[in-house]
Amino acid sequence: MKIIKYVLSLAILNLIALILVTLGLPDIVPLHINIFGAIDSFGSKWFIPIIGMIPVLIAVIYIIYTYYLQSDLNKEIENKIIPTIAIIFIPFTWILVIFSLKFSDTVNSLHPSTNFASINIIVFVLVILALLFIFISFYLENLKQNWYIGIRTPWTLKNELVWKKTHKLGKYTFRIGGILLLIHAIAVFLTFNFFYAIIGLIMVIIIIAGIPILYSYKEYKKIKK
């Protein structure tokens, strides 16, 4: 509980910093990067502090949850995973700021420097996600059946044995997926290919989430026969 309060304080300070930085940005800033690493969408600079609200909201909602809804079932694991997710969102909130400081709304989105910045940011995102997946993998198998956190499919929620088997498998898919994503991040950095960075990320997500979902369905049908 103390950790999430520290995270909330950090998230609020981060939001204040984002607001102060936003005041000095152009009124129109880059908001979206396509699969080729080019900026293809612009909008109001005040979208940046809105993104900065995400870690604040995660922390606030979790604090409310701990007071009124949290049980002892997965308390220890939840108190590690949720604050970590909130902390990880904080550096993500600065991605648009980085682009805004480098480019204005008149920048040609195909300029080489734009693609270079895009690659650096996607590599950063891949590494953070990889570490998050690996971190979560150490706790998945010990998660008890619940409606809030874990691999929640219709079949894991209906059957406790399916829940246990799916999360045991998920421990390995998350860990393997995280390691593959780290390797992929290095490859993206070396090859300078934004398109394949996105394709690789999608493939890893299929490994991490798709396999356990299909497995839970298969196991549930097997038990019901």
Briefly describe each language-model feature range:
Residues 1-11, 46:
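N-terminal membrane topogenic signal
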Residues 6-8, 50-52, 61-63, 81-89, ...:
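Select subsegments of transmembrane alpha-helices in polytopic membrane proteins
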Residues 19-50, 149-158:
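Active-site and channel-lining beta-strand-loop segments
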Residues 21-25, 57-68, 135-151, 215-222:
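Membrane-water interface of transmembrane alpha-helices
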Residues 41-55, 118-136, 203-204:
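Alpha-helical transmembrane segments
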Residues 64-117:
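Ordered, amphipathic secondary-structure segments that act as subunit-interaction surfaces
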Residues 128, 196-212:
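Small-residue-rich transmembrane alpha-helices that serve as helix-helix interface/gating elements
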Residues 153-169:
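Short membrane-interface loop/juxtamembrane segments of multi-pass integral membrane proteins
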